[in-house]
From Swiss-Prot:
Organism: Xanthomonas oryzae pv. oryzae (strain KACC10331 / KXO85)
GO biological process, one term: leucyl-tRNA aminoacylation
Keyword Cytoplasm listed: yes
Protein name: Leucine--tRNA ligase
Keyword Ligase applies: yes
Residues binding ATP, per UniProt: K641
Motif residue range(s): 'HIGH' region: 46-56
Molecular-function annotations in GO: aminoacyl-tRNA deacylase activity; ATP binding; leucine-tRNA ligase activity
Gene Ontology cellular component terms for the protein in this record: cytosol
CDD domains to which the protein is assigned, alphabetical: Anticodon_Ia_Leu_BEm (cd07958), LeuRS_core (cd00812)
Disulfide links within the chain: none
Reactions accelerated catalytically: tRNA(Leu) + L-leucine + ATP = L-leucyl-tRNA(Leu) + AMP + diphosphate
Length: 880
């Protein structure tokens, strides 16, 4: 048993003792040989940046609270930890610090592991891995070669977002306002060879699967549905003529609004479209525009906000119904990577086309009207003023100016046009998706090598499995740009596995989302020779996944897709990787600054600022502690380095102890909401911990408590016991169903306050207090496990792993107020009695009757058909 100074709460001594016990007993190491139901709980694995931030602490504490609670409710719980260790920050740090990325990464992992352990998380460290090690990434290399052979991994030229500073391709989501998310450089368009995974082959399954994810937030599912972007429409062929009237390759366009076809007045194509390149050969002005457009982004979000630009190509498209020739324009809002790189422009019923047509003086024709306009404005159509109803497909519409299609509604026009084009071979019905195939190539060094060899004779050849892993050299000299493996001939040059001739390795590395797309499964099978083994099907799918909503589209989409690839490779049985998803809110804090000489702001850390308040406690200003001079208050924002408003978790642990930091991070806000960091609030949690510590020691110092005799309790004693069991019931629900940890803590605090006012020193008074204190210690254990570990011993229960102690269960009989005694009958025969409140609800009476021990014995194996209650006398359960 650990020893601590009585009545003095020393969190560091308490926490060291508890952590030593957990380490010595390997308390949180689990296996699959358990009769308990499994529960797999994890947080999104961290990038080893060098230090934990408060966002990490909140994320991992949420997971830990749930994990510890589930252990106490009889589950076999897996809570692992690893490191998402590849990525650009390591390369940037290597350049800055003149050290190899591997050395920087492994040092950071060691430091952050120690930080996590100091917070007392119930992690099975035997399953730890870093994704940058060959024994991890060999498995994704092997999977990739198998996907190549199945045609699910392929290489093609693609127009990409190119960051000229970081010398790498960026995903659309990594381009912010036309600039690279890390470097800030203006992003260019480039066409380069890229490796892709065919996520589009799984688009419909990814969409349908969202309907089965009842435990995921609706907001995340909506974001994924929108990103997948399923749409039904027609693909229509437009014949194309050059300036001399000669036929060129036809254009195929996809539209969800074929009813507006007669309103087509031009066709727009992407700057990279073959027809645009063809036209530019004889048009220097067009060629110059195409070169300029290379520097625009390729994300849809950018296209929505940027100025519409374009130029006529001199080519014409033949309208497939009227035969009229309409001009073909290059437009900067058309992407080659989306659809066919061409769209039919209907400026009368598409706002983007409307703006473009008005800018360049192109015709605008109305071909749809509202059948039942709601006002005069909806009866007017103006080619110079956009109105939302022009494109509102949800309203009842009718075609006009559309020849034989006049009078049809949307559905009728769709069917008529589909039948016509399919009969004439000019088009077909088609389902289209906004989702694009996943480009997994990155032109960086610090990533998993793509296991491909290029042979002049054989082409792209997957590295044979017996030659895997392709190991990334870690001891490299790092330059400011590019990749050291590109300039290392000893690594790059090799032989072709097919013909034995000279060949070269692929020098691109995988997008780091590859590693984080399957790591959840790897935790289940540490050290397995394959990617996973049979243990994966014991643990998968994970029961709870905790992480930020900012990962809703990228990580969580790839994560689901890769799991389906593993399923189809017969590595796992489940369709989805995670059953329940909890997206925690941000951690925010006050910001302070002074105006800088360059017109910017010098941000000041809150720890260096003193807040000034008036006599009513209202904030009146702030001063820098160092010089006493005023600083500006900038409001509350997400903790970040840029705003210098972060709080170092280690300094908080050093000052208050891990339990207090954990307690505040769970108390300050519900998990899904933003948490405003406030050290005064941390102070309040520290006071509560000291008060609880003192309550337990004062009680124990007054002598041993006798056994509780419920029948002998006074009204006041019953009231305290009722409060205890009401708290147990609420906290159980808050932990298990609602994940409402702040209200659970508040309930325990209320019980503590009630107990402080209860000064009954009689034997049964002390017995009631003993029960209440034991309950409080156990109820808080998921959040404050170190203090609970110590206080359980102080209460005379010995040193043990509290996660193996059953979570308290509310005694329903203790909840009764002004009890009545009711006879409990099973099919008319007396089987017991229950005490219920005079105003007890029917549901409570029914539950108590069925829970009565003798009645429960007679009900075993029977189905309850109905329950008859004679008020104040009898509960008759009819069962059979």
């Amino acid at each position: 048993m650990s020893t601590v100074e009585p009545n003095v709460y020393d969190p560091h001594q308490v926490e060291t003792s508890a952590q030593q016990f957990w380490d010595a007993t390997r308390a949180f190491q689990v296996d699959e040989n358990s009769e308990k139901p499994k529960f797999y709980c994890l947080s999104m694995l961290p990038y080893p940046s060098g230090a934990l931030h408060m966002g990490h602490v909140r994320n991992y504490t949420i997971s830990d609270v749930v994990s510890r609670y589930k252990r106490m409710t009889g589950h076999n719980v897996l809570q692992p930890m690893g490191w998402d260790a590849f990525g650009l920050p390591a390369e940037n740090a290597a350049i800055k610090n003149k050290t190899a990325p591997a050395k920087w990464t492994y040092a950071n992992i060691a430091h952050m592991r120690a930080q996590l352990k100091s917070l007392g998380y119930a992690i099975d460290w035997s399953r730890e891995f870093a994704t940058c090690t060959p024994d991890y990434y060999v498995h994704e290399q092997r999977m990739f070669t198998r996907l190549m052979r199945k045609g699910l991994a392929y290489r093609r030229n693609a127009v990409v977002n190119w960051d000229p500073i970081d010398q790498t391709v960026l995903a659309n989501e990594q381009v912010i306002d036309g600039r690279g998310w890390r470097s800030g450089a203006v992003v260019e368009k480039r066409e380069i060879p890229q490796w892709f995974l065919r996520i589009t082959d799984y688009a419909q399954e990814l969409l349908d699967g969202l309907d089965q994810l009842d435990g995921w937030p609706d907001s995340v599912k909506t974001m994924q549905r929108n990103w997948i972007g399923r749409s039904e429409g027609l693909e229509i062929q437009f014949d194309v003529r050059d300036t001399n009237g000669a036929a060129l390759d036809p254009l195929r366009v996809f539209t969800t609004r074929p009813d507006t076809l007669m309103g087509v007045t031009f066709v727009s194509i992407a700057a990279e479209h073959p027809l645009a390149l063809h036209a530019a050969k004889s048009n220097p002005e067009l060629a110059a525009l195409l070169e300029t457009l290379k520097h625009g982004g390729v994300s849809e979000a950018e296209l929505e906000t940027q100025e519409k630009r374009g130029m006529a190509t001199g080519l014409t498209a033949v309208h497939p119904i009227s035969g009229e020739q309409v001009p073909v324009w290059v437009a900067n809002f058309v992407l080659m990577g989306y659809g066919t790189g061409a769209v039919m422009a209907v400026p009368g019923h598409d706002q983007r086309d409307f703006e473009f047509a008005n800018k360049y003086g192109l015709p605008i024709v109305q071909v749809v009207k509202l059948r039942e306009p709601r006002n005069d404005d909806e009866q007017r159509w103006d080619a110079t003023e956009w109105r939302d109803w022009y494109t509102d497909k949800s309203r009842e519409l009718e075609l006009i100016n559309s020849a034989e299609f006049d009078g049809l509604d949307f559905g009728g026009a769709f069917e008529a046009l589909a039948e016509r084009f399919e009969r004439k071979g000019q088009g077909q019905r088609r389902v289209n998706y906004r989702l694009r195939d996943w480009g997994v190539s990155r032109q960086r060094y610090w990533g998993c090598p793509i296991p491909v060899i290029y042979c002049p004779k054989c082409g792209a050849v997957p590295v044979p499995e017996d030659q895997l892993p392709v190991v990334l050299p870690e001891n490299v000299e790092f330059a400011c740009t590019g990749s050291p493996i590109k300039t290392d001939p000893t690594w790059r040059q090799t032989t072709c596995p097919d013909c034995g001739g000279p060949a070269e390795r692929e020098t691109d590395t995988f997008d780091t989302f590859m590693e984080s797309s399957w790591y959840v499964a790897r935790y289940t099978s540490p050290n397995a020779r394959e990617m996973v083994d049979r243990r994966a099907n014991y643990w998968m799918p994970a029961d709870l996944y905790v992480g930020g909503i900012e990962h809703a589209i990228l990580h969580l989409m790839y994560f689901r897709f890769y799991h389906k690839l593993m399923r189809d490779a017969r590595l796992v049985d489940s369709d989805e990787p995670v059953t329940n998803l909890l997206t925690q809110g941000m951690v925010i804090a006050d910001t302070f600054y002074r105006d800088a000489d360059n017109g910017g702001k010098d941000w000041i850390n809150p720890a260096d600022v003193e807040i000034q308040r008036d006599e009513r406690g209202r904030v009146t200003g702030a001063v820098l502690i160092a010089d006493g001079q005023p600083v500006h208050i900038g409001g509350t924002e997400k903790m970040s380095k840029s705003k210098n408003n972060g709080v170092d978790p280690q300094s908080m642990v050093a000052k208050y102890g891990a339990d207090t930091v954990r307690l505040f991070s769970m108390f300050a806000a519900p998990p899904e909401q933003s948490l405003e960091w406030n050290e005064a609030g941390v102070d309040g949690m520290a006071r509560f911990m000291r008060r609880l510590w003192a309550q337990v020691h004062k009680h124990v110092g007054e002598g041993a408590a006798v056994a509780l005799d419920v029948a002998a309790l006074s009204a006041e004693q019953k009231a305290i016991r009722r409060k205890t069991h009401e708290t147990i019931g609420k906290v159980s629900d808050d932990y298990g169903r609602r994940h409402s940890f702040n209200t659970a803590i508040a309930a325990v605090m209320e019980l503590s306050n009630a107990l402080a006012k209860f000064d009954d020193a009689s034997d049964q008074g002390r017995a009631v207090r003993q029960e209440a204190l034991e309950a409080m210690v156990l109820l808080l254990n998921p959040i404050t496990p170190h203090a609970s570990h110590a206080l359980w011993q102080v209460l005379g229960r010995g040193e043990t792993l509290l996660e193996n102690v059953a979570f308290p269960q509310a005694d329903v009989s203790a909840l009764v107020r002004d009890a009545l005694t009711l006879a409990v009958q099973i099919n008319g025969k007396l089987r017991g009695t229950i005490d219920v409140a005079a105003d007890a609800a029917r549901e409570q009476i029914e539950a108590l009757a069925q829970a009565e021990p003798n009645a429960a014995k007679f009900l075993d194996g029977l189905s309850v058909r109905k329950i008859i209650i004679v008020p104040g006398k009898i509960v008759n359960i009819v069962a059979g």
